[in-house]
A protein has these predicted regions:
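N-proximal low-complexity "stem/linker" segments adjacent to membrane-targeting elements
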Residues: 116-166
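A short, conserved alpha-helix in the catalytic core of glycosyltransferases
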Residues: 291-336
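C-terminal, non-catalytic tails of nucleotide-sugar-dependent glycosyltransferases
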Residues: 125-146, 254, 268-295, 300, ...
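Conserved donor NDP-sugar-binding/catalytic core segment of glycosyltransferases
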Residues: 234, 238-270
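A conserved hydrophobic helix/loop-capping motif in glycosyltransferases and polysaccharide synthases
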Residues: 147-159, 163, 170, 182, ...
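Short beta-strand-to-loop acidic/aromatic patch adjacent to the donor-nucleotide binding site
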Residues: 223-234
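Acidic donor-binding segment of Leloir-type glycosyltransferases
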Residues: 167-207, 436
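Active-site nucleotide-sugar/metal-binding loop of Leloir-type enzymes
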Residues: 215-225
Length: 516
């Protein structure tokens, strides 16, 4: 946050004037008005003045990218001078210059005026965020495109070409589709390659300087759904169609990602709904989501910005958490395959991300996101022909419950599964609500347990975090009574517990597994 609020206010007013000038420039080009060169010079002078003031503020608040965005806008204006084709000029002003100026305004407003003050940030989230990034509009009840394919170039030009080749093969024929190609400062070769691709349904944003901020993409998409990917990824031929089928299979699904494999396993897989796995968190290097809902703009950083580095692995964690807490289901389509270039993890980014995420979202995103293989190895998932009911007790994000559900669906070809949740930890209550058919928060097991799902019987009961009350003999006996014939109860504890002589019973790692 910058200290000189008056300076910030004046700069915002200057950028607002610049934004109006950009729209006027578009009108002048459209109508073949005279005085275009002088008008552009005036805009350049205004940008240079803004840049001089903003550069000093970046020293004060390093999270700002406004100086880079202003420099990108200057580069765009210079580029216009060398273009004679009217249609191309209009495209650059509309798809590059105006969005760059809009991004500069929001950047200074939020990172200069709100971050890192939580109260100011939440004020922005609640009252301004959606105003600056409105969802695409319909025309006569219909979106302009069925699908917006948004590609963020963050690799060399050869990998960019490879990514787009696989992508073009994967986009289903017959879709009303647009492409939004975002070159985030990765060089002139990529910029030229993108410029050569400009067409009626291809929008290009060429940044001179890297910002690592794909929020600009959300200013341009006009499709019903948005497929986002970075050029580090390549897709199988059936990936997009299978992801789209998964997304539209249930109105509650908010986002879908592919399954990531090695390139030599990038097969064209037929549609297979048994491979659609509900997740607590998605990998958003490739992700498909409706354009008018909260998940895609959150992942892009247009909604709920919280971390100075912008697009990182925490973008997917933020999108997933916001999605869960808005009642949206997250799916990995196992019949949609993708391959990504290996990336080294930046420990500094991880540490900053954990700190900022926990401060704003109220939860550590790195905790308990791995499936417990010891647990799964002690359970049987075959021949489950009837409806399968799973009860989780203190299941955090529900990772293991979803893994059990996935294995039942795959191995028994059975989609009739229900997850129930009993939970003592308030921090996870809203996350569990998103995955459970029924869930209850419990503060007193003696008083409340008998009232919880009294008629339900379970194939699996999984107690992930224990305490003295949960390991009480009477409660354990009541839980065993809630198992169906052939059911199993898994308790995560290395301590001595009642029923130690119960048979049949198996101990795997820290899990004690009781079979009925």
């Amino acid at each position: 946050m910058i200290k000189d609020k008056e300076m910030g206010k004046k700069l915002l007013e200057s950028i607002e004037t610049l934004n109006e000038a950009a729209y006027e420039l578009y009108s002048m080009v459209l109508n073949d008005n005279e005085g275009l060169d002088d008008f552009v010079k005036t805009m350049q002078a205004l940008l240079i003045g803004i840049k001089g003031n903003v550069t000093g503020l970046v020293v004060e608040e390093p999270a700002l990218k406004c100086n880079l965005l202003v420099d990108n806008a200057l580069d765009t204006l210079e580029k216009l001078d060398g273009i004679s084709e009217k249609k191309r000029k209009l495209g650059i002003i509309k798809n590059e210059l105006i969005p760059e100026i809009g991004e500069a305004y929001v950047d200074l407003l939020f990172w200069g005026g709100c971050f890192p003050d939580p109260d100011a940030m939440f004020e922005y989230y609640n009252n301004q965020m959606k105003e600056f990034y409105p969802a695409p509009e319909k025309d006569k009840g219909r979106y302009r495109y069925d699908l917006s394919v948004a590609v963020m170039a963050n690799t060399d030009v050869e990998q960019v070409k490879k990514c787009l080749k696989f992508l073009n093969d994967a986009v289903p024929e017959g879709l009303r589709c647009e492409y939004v190609l975002f070159n985030d400062g990765v060089g002139k070769k990529v910029a030229k390659y993108f410029d050569d691709l400009v067409d009626k349904n291809v929008k290009v944003i060429n940044y001179k300087h890297q910002t690592n901020a794909p929020s600009v993409i959300y200013q341009l998409v006009e499709g019903k759904d948005v497929l986002f990917l970075t050029t580090e990824n390549i897709l199988s031929k059936t990936a997009v169609s299978n992801m789209m089928k998964c997304l539209t299979s249930d109105k509650k699904i908010g986002a879908v990602c592919p399954a990531f494999v090695e390139e030599d396993k990038l097969d064209d897989t037929e549609i297979n709904e048994y491979l659609w796995h509900q997740k607590s968190e998605l990998n958003t290097d490739v992700v498909l989501a409706p354009s008018n809902e909260i998940l895609m703009p959150t992942m892009l950083g247009a909604y709920f910005p919280f971390m100075a580095k912008r697009y990182t692995e925490f973008s997917s964690k933020a999108m997933s958490l916001i999605g869960r807490r808005n009642g949206k289901l997250l799916y990995e389509a196992g019949d949609a395959l993708a391959c990504r270039v290996h990336k080294e993890e930046d420990e500094d980014i991880v540490l900053e991300g954990i700190k900022q995420f926990e401060r704003i979202m109220g939860i550590n995103p790195m905790l308990e996101q791995d499936v417990d293989q010891d647990l799964l190895s002690g359970l049987d998932f075959k021949n489950k022909e009837k409806r399968v009911d799973i009860l989780g007790i203190n299941s955090s994000f529900g990772i293991n419950l979803l893994a059990i559900q996935d294995r039942v669906r795959e191995e028994s070809k059975n989609l009739r599964t229900n997850i129930y949740s009993l939970n003592e930890e308030e921090a996870y209550e809203r996350d569990l609500e998103a995955i459970a058919k029924k869930g209850r928060f419990i503060s007193d097991w003696d008083k409340d347990f008998d009232k919880c799902f009294p008629n339900a019987r379970f194939d699996y009961i999984v107690m992930e975090k224990t305490n003295g009350k949960l390991l009480d003999l009477m409660l354990l006996l009541k839980l065993l009574e809630r198992l169906k014939d052939g059911g199993v109860m898994a308790i995560h504890t290395a301590e001595e517990m009642p029923l130690s002589d119960y048979e049949p019973r198996k101990v795997i790692g820290d899990w004690q597994i009781l079979y009925k």
